[in-house]
Amino acid sequence: MPKSGAIVYAHRHISKDPLISKAIALYDGHMSYYVNSLKAANSNYAYPTLGSTFAIHAETYAQVRGYPKRNAGEDFHLLNKIAKTSRIQYSTETTIGLEARLSNRVPIGTGPSIKKILDIIEKDPSGQSYLSYNPLLFKFLARALKEICSFARAPCQFDEIIGSKLDELGFQKIASTLHSHYRSSDQRQENLDQWFDALKTLRFLHKAESHYPKQSLLGTLRVLPRKERESIVSKNPKLSELLSNF
């Protein structure tokens, strides 16, 4: 365990039920694809956010005042706070096995997602109808992050679409005073990194889906470079099986 921050461990869900096993394979594949794509886009928030699979240093936990009181997504928001103050390490050396289960306890999360995927594969057992993020969406994110980095150095014009999506997130409020409040580009970059956090990254992607709509997860994985695809399916045998039948 590091002296501060958190470690997020790789995980996989386990189920003896063949339908749930197929559904969770797609869900885990989607989440791994999301994290890998964030990393490729050079996001500072490229880590899984499943609470059962991370450990937090006690001092860091106290610093961020523990778990936020929310009906759902507590793990996501806790790690988002930690990422702004400490380092989050993603470890793939140890994989934690979790029993897959259905749940209506919260409106979003693993349980509700599995139930939605079950509805999809009951109509389409191949799993091809399960949609995930368009790969072009993350290239768009990478461009946005580069332009934000350029803005930290000096005021500049954003791409029209990128600028409009950032403005929908309230970018103008921080942009209007950034260069007058912070003299160094490093300070400005740090401030922008904290503003464009995990939540705003996710909201940015959702807003940009009007330009880059979702597409089949299996179809996307199939055309990924082999190394990228293997990093997602190597510990997900059921997903590998679904891909081979695609």
Model regions: which residues?
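Terminal low-complexity segments of carbohydrate-biosynthetic enzymes
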Residues: 116-246
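A recurrent flexible, glycine/aromatic-enriched loop bordering the glycosyltransferase active site
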Residues: 32-55
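Acidic donor-binding loop at a coil-to-helix junction in glycosyltransferase catalytic cores
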Residues: 70-77
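Catalytic donor-sugar/metal-binding loop of nucleotide-sugar-dependent glycosyltransferases
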Residues: 70, 82-97, 103
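PAPS-dependent sulfotransferase catalytic core
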Residues: 94-124
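Conserved donor NDP-sugar-binding/catalytic core segment of glycosyltransferases
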Residues: 1-24
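Short, well-ordered alpha-helical scaffold segment located
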Residues: 59-60, 95
